[in-house]
Amino acid sequence: MRGGQKGLPFYLFTLILLLGGCQQNDGKCYIEGTVNGEKYEGKRIFVVPLNGPTTAEYVDSMEIKDGKFHFVKDFTKDTIQMYKILLDYHYRMGLQPLFIVGEPGTIKVTIDSISHATGTPQNDSLEQWKVQTEIHNRQLGMMRSNIVNLNKQGDSIHAKYIQQRADSFHLAYKNYTRQLAKNMEGLVLGDFLKNLYPLTYKRQLPDGRIVTMNADTNEEIPE
């Protein structure tokens, strides 16, 4: 009898783990979020498909309570896809809309001036890319501002040098995005990233011919 009592806590612990694991593997996406700022209390927040219909039957919404919100997407019914989380348009100023991949598991979301989402494989990768994107945008913006100021001062030599650095910096970021898209090939995030910086594009010439152009150099690729 005593042996059975000793085994009971271990049994309960195992049962708790199994039940906890069920939530992560039941084909549902649990979005658990917080919004920083008391002024958003009671305001509505929305989960909107990034692509496709955005009519009422495809959009989820709820009121923020105690700075928190919670959504459940059932992927036995819904298609795994990209979503955008954002507040009612009257209250979006100062808050960054957030892209997420709606996939099974629990996604931890923070809506703020810089928003974040982590907790599932694709969303963890998306968050890492988002951090790199913010660094890229900030530094590239500073370089471009510097170029404008140098040109105003008549210093075209230094402006040209910084432009070359900016071009190289931007190309490195595009290649980083392309490589991540390749690593995520076949997944929703891979498709999203792949469409951001294609390697080529088509252009119609004055004579009517359609040619393939290098997206990085804007030069024609010989057939």
Predicted regions and their residues:
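Amphipathic alpha-helical repeat scaffolds of TPR domains
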Residues: 186-200
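A non-transmembrane, solvent-exposed segment enriched in polar/low-complexity residues
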Residues: 22-174
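Alpha-helix capping and inter-helical loop/turn segments
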Residues: 37-38, 201-203
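N-proximal helix/coil linker or "cap" segments that precede and/or mark the start of modular domains
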Residues: 207-223
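Bacterial Sec-dependent N-terminal signal peptides
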Residues: 1-34
